[in-house]
Amino acid sequence: MSRHKSKSIPGRNLRLAEQIQKDLAGIIQREIDMTRAGLITLSGVELSADYAHAKVYFTVLGAEPDTAAALLNEKAGWLHSQLYKLLHIHTVPTLRFVHDPQLERGIEMSMLIDRANRGPHSGVPDEPEDQS
């Protein structure tokens, strides 16, 4: 899923955002030791109208989002140089990685729906009670 704001050439913006997302995902998977950062999935790229800046949205499992964001942003310059080698465009955007909480929100919503569907008379407790 690519996010784009630009009205200038929306098709190009969308294609470029998707290509950046695809290429970055491959580079991160092959080239960066992400053991400290958990399992990272790139969920979207939002390009500025002039293509100079890109917000790269990610989700993470198995680690704190702040840890993953710090590691990705620390590697942003190197990732930019790797993208430059792959993309055949004049300006490769600077990268800023931002945690995308959509996955967590989706899980929370699913739990709320399940709880509502169980109803008050289902005999299944909503939350396990703390015995301490």
Swiss-Prot record:
Disulfide bonds: none annotated. One of its GO terms (cellular component) is cytosol. Keywords: Cytoplasm, Ribosome biogenesis. Pfam families: RBFA (PF02033). Belongs to the RbfA family. One of several proteins that assist in the late maturation steps of the functional core of the 30S ribosomal subunit. Associates with free 30S ribosomal subunits (but not with 30S subunits that are part of 70S ribosomes or polysomes). Required for efficient processing of 16S rRNA. May interact with the 5'-terminal helix region of 16S rRNA. One of its GO terms (biological process) is maturation of SSU-rRNA. This is Ribosome-binding factor A. It is found in: Cytoplasm. One of its GO terms (molecular function) is ribosomal small subunit binding. InterPro entries: KH_dom-like_a/b, RbfA, RbfA_dom_sf. Monomer. Binds 30S ribosomal subunits, but not 50S ribosomal subunits or 70S ribosomes.
